[in-house]
Each structure stands twice: as C-alpha cells, then as structure tokens.
Amino acid sequence: RIAPGRGFNFSDGKQPLAMARKSLTEMADLLNLQSAAETHLAQYEDFIRSMKPRFVKRGARPLLLTTLIDPRHMLVFGPNSLFQEILDEYGIPNAWQGETNFWGSTAVSIDRLAAYKDVDVLCFDHDNSKDMDALMATPLWQAMPFVRAGRFQRVPAVWFYGATLSAMHFVRVLDNAIGG
C-alpha cells in the first residue's frame, strides 16, 4: 500500500460536464480546496454565459462535430458527449442523433456522412494532415454536400474526454469557427 486512493466519476454517460463539475466539487471538498473550486466553476459559468451572444445570429443549421480516425473513418460526437451541454446552452442543434458509446462518440465510415446535407461540419485536427489530405482528395469527399457548400472546417484539437477547461477551449474553437 502506497497511499489512500479516491476515484471520481468522469461521466454518467449522459451529461459529462455536469458530472465533471460535481466531481470537481467532491475533489475540492476532499482536499479542502472548496474556494479554488468555487472560483473556477464561477469563472467557467461566467465564460460560458459571456460567449452565448456570439452564437445568437448563427441560425438553426445543425452542427456535426467530427475528428478523423483514418482516411475511411471519422469519430462523430453525439448527444451525450462533452460538447452537448455547450451546444444546448447556445441553441446549436447537434446533427448527429445516431448511436454513440458511453463517451458520446462513435466511429463511422466516411460514406455515412453523405446523408448530412444542410449542416456545418467541424473536424478537430490531431496531427493527421497526411490522412486528412488523402481523404480530401477522394471523389467521395469532394461530393459531400457540406464540402460542396463550403461548410466544412478543420479546427484545432479539443480534448474530447476532458472537463470544464476542455469545454472552455471548445467554446473558443467554436467561436473562431462559427461564432459571430
């Protein structure tokens, strides 16, 4: 035995940000850092609230959040992902309403994305330019409705399985891509 341990839940499979805030508070109580946690959570809430006006004029076009796995597959993020509470707060519909795993994502073949016509698509980069270039050179990709309409953007990486700091980074990335 080295030291006592304590686990904290990352997600309940439904609302990871709500669970992260709860776990942060529990950890702060255990470490007697309640004030620091309260300060951080207040800053988080203020930041999220302050950014909301940036998305008011965006309209109701659904947003598909993705990241490339390989030239034939993407990971898509659905309703129980880290990003959903932010999308809900800002009134941005999540285009992916299909199946997801516990983490709110699922791997899909590229051809499944052809069904998404009137959507904005953001793809989180993660040092995969070679694979992305290979995908973007294919006729299948070039025929995607959102590609032809100029509504596909590569954006900086966001830690999909993070907590409040990742959510704040996501909001900054989202603002740079589709905010107003």
Annotate each language-model stretch with its function.
Residues R1-I69, F160, T164-G180:
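Extracytoplasmic substrate-binding proteins
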Residues I2-A3, Y90, V147-R148:
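Short, structured coil segments at secondary-structure junctions
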Residues R6-F8, L63-T66, A95, V121-F124, ...:
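Structural recognition of the beta-strand scaffold that forms the well-ordered cores
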Residues Q15, M19-K22, Y116-G180:
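Structured C-terminal subdomain patch of bacterial secreted/periplasmic proteins
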Residues P53-R58, V76, I86, L113-A115:
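Short, conserved, surface-exposed binding loops centered on an aromatic residue
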Residues L75-T106, W159:
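Alpha-helical, coiled-coil/dimerization segments enriched in small aliphatic residues
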Residues A107-D118:
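Short helices/loops that flank or line small-molecule/ion binding pockets
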